[in-house]
Regions:
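A general alpha-helix detector
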Residues: 287, 322, 337, 369-372
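Short secondary-structure junctions
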Residues: 249-250, 346-348
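Helix N-cap / loop-to-helix initiation motif
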Residues: 296-298, 369, 380
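Surface-exposed loop-to-helix/strand elements on domain peripheries
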Residues: 218-231, 255-333, 347-363, 394-404
Length: 404
């Protein structure tokens, strides 16, 4: 009977996006986005692996895209455009929510502008930033469905705004490229949280560690020595597979060793003990705190409580800080070129177009009137102004566009 020594440890099949190693890509047609031109896909994958990281990106996009818009209601054409900006039936708010999400996630976002030579219509379309690359002339954006297998004949080239170029369907098209400035990066923006990728990896791996413990039914890891004689490699493989299903809970948590059998069965399990639970929990807590800082964001605005719990005053205070340091600046960047496009193509004054921002929790009773709320906030108010006679309960649900 032959002697077979078999050691088996099953490796976790889940791909770790943080261990990505890029292969450099060169092209004469576009500027690569990352050394392998796949940085946006990597950032997208990372956002799907870290709960806190993803929650902050979602919340930033929601806050930046606001709760609606105020504008001059006498501009009927402007009102209709805000209600539907393209043939897909999207509102301006829905469009800008996608744009704000891309910009928060990737540091870049794109809006396609469609019109004709007579400016008889205007449509705006969000373009998935992962499909866009800056052309080598730095004056066009290339759109392609598969950057793993780029083909110039399948790519669509659009000029950067304010230039327009005619297309095969008779329309004139252009594209707006929003990007977060970063020294040394000319063609693409860099997301503000880039310095926090390391701590995002820690949060991801601590989550993965907890999942592994759960899959293993919280059994200790260790080495299982099976005292059994086998005739060939196939029998050894079968024995290890059966033992995995019986003992390991989750493949990869237990290493199996099959050794030559003897008259006495000396099979035994040798646990590998560790007392590092506290270290992992502290790492996860610190990583969560650092992710919030890297995003220039605030804990209470993303459902992350403090040791003292949630407090409405703290939420309102952090919202005010976020509004003045992050939200308003991002909103201004998004709206400025759109106001210009609307005015130039539709011929209406879009200067009155502004976001409506509301805190995540009410700070005033809903039975107050608008002029009373403005007085309480130290703003100009007029008790005789008809527009300020609405109760807060009314404008939180209806007629948002009528409040100046």
């Amino acid at each position: 009977m032959s002697k077979v020594n078999k050691i088996c440890g099953v490796v976790d099949s889940r791909v770790d996006p943080y261990s990505h190693r890029a292969a450099k890509v060169e092209s004469r047609e576009f500027w690569r986005w990352g050394s392998d031109n796949r940085l946006p896909f990597l950032l997208s994958e990372i956002s799907r692996c870290s709960t806190t990281h993803r929650r902050i990106i979602n919340d930033k996009a929601d806050y930046i895209s606001g709760k609606g818009f105020t504008f001059d209601t006498e501009q009927q054409l402007l009102s209709e455009f805000v209600a539907q900006v393209n043939s897909s039936g999207e509102t301006l708010r829905q469009l800008l929510n996608k744009v704000a999400f891309d910009k928060a996630l990737l540091g870049n976002a794109f809006i396609e502008i469609v019109t004709d030579s007579d400016h008889t219509f205007l449509s705006l379309y969000h373009q998935d930033a992962t499909r866009c690359r800056v052309a080598k002339d730095s004056e066009h954006i290339l759109l392609h469905h598969n950057w793993n297998n780029f083909s110039s004949k399948d790519a669509v080239s659009l000029p950067l705004y304010p230039k327009f170029e005619p297309q095969a369907d008779g329309t004139l098209r252009s594209i707006i490229h929003y990007k977060d400035y970063e020294p040394g990066f000319e063609h693409y923006g860099v997301p503000p949280y880039i310095a926090g990728l390391g701590v995002s990896a820690i949060a991801y791996k601590t989550d993965k560690w907890n999942i592994s413990r759960l899959d293993n039914s919280f059994q200790p890891s260790g080495v299982m020595i099976l005292d059994e004689a086998v005739d060939n490699e196939f029998d050894a493989e079968r024995m290890v597979h059966n033992a995995e299903e019986r003992f390991s809970g989750k493949p990869g948590q237990v290493m199996f060793i099959v050794k030559d059998g003897s008259e006495k069965d000396n099979s035994r399990f040798l646990p590998i003990s560790a007392s590092s639970d506290g270290d992992w929990e502290a790492l996860h807590t610190q990583a969560t705190n650092d992710i919030v800082v890297a995003h220039s964001w605030f804990r209470s605005l993303s459902g992350l409580d403090y040791s003292t719990g949630f407090n409405s005053e703290r939420i309102l205070h952090e919202y005010e800080v976020a509004l003045n340091t992050v939200i308003l600046g991002e909103q201004a960047e998004l709206l400025e070129p759109l106001r210009e496009v609307i005015t130039a193509i539709l011929g209406v004054d879009a200067s009155s177009l502004e976001f409506v921002n509301r805190p995540p929790t009410r700070s005033k009773p809903i039975y107050m009137k608008v002029w009373e709320a403005r007085r309480a906030d130290g703003l100009d108010y007029d008790p005789e102004d008809e527009r300020q006679q609405y109760y807060l309960s009314e404008i939180s649900k209806y007629n948002v566009t009528k409040i100046g």
